[in-house]
Amino acid sequence: MLATELAVTHPELVRRILLMGIPYYDAEGRQERFDRLGQVKPWPDSFAAVAQDWIFAVEMRNEKVSLERAFGNYLESAGAWQGKARIYGAVFQYPAEERAPLLTQPTLVLNPHGNLKEPSRAYAELIDGATLIELPDLKYGIFDAAPEVLASHARPFLNQR
């Protein structure tokens, strides 16, 4: 959504937009997520508090993502524990329905089939003329697991004149 806002407010700087893994939800869905995730949480005092981060980063990792890389992702997530509320707050308070339709640049949405599959599809529908490419074989860890697949779609799109 940061790319959307930059493109809308500074169209002279943004020639094309490539989006992927978009956490877009309708107003009710955003409010529910903001209420749940937008408040600073106290530092965890048990593993149970961070278990979901571990499951996502390590246990659900793509088979092509090394344990070392997955563990690093987990540590990064844990280190940002209290900062996550500000990130989620910005994402879930962003007026996407108002801003996305203002995009005038060619837009490509790559859609891996992880947990943001449906939200990404819905966001693409807000953008007039957006191209949506489904990537059903990709789910998580896509930058590590399939950079060549992403590049095979991104390069031709970004290199167009």
Positions of PLM-derived features:
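Active-site nucleophile elbow and catalytic-triad environment of alpha/beta-hydrolase enzymes
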Residues: 81-99, 113-118
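Conserved hydrolase catalytic core segment
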Residues: 1-30
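Short, well-ordered alpha-helices that flank and scaffold nucleotide-derived cofactor binding pockets
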Residues: 8-12, 125, 152, 156
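Helix-rich cap/lid subdomain of alpha/beta-hydrolase
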Residues: 20-74, 79-89
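Conserved loop-alpha-helix segment in the C-terminal half of the alpha/beta-hydrolase fold
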Residues: 106-145
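Short aromatic-enriched loop/helix-cap "lid" or pocket-rim segments at secondary-structure transitions
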Residues: 28-33, 121, 145-146
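Post-His helix in hydrolase/transferase enzymes
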Residues: 143-158
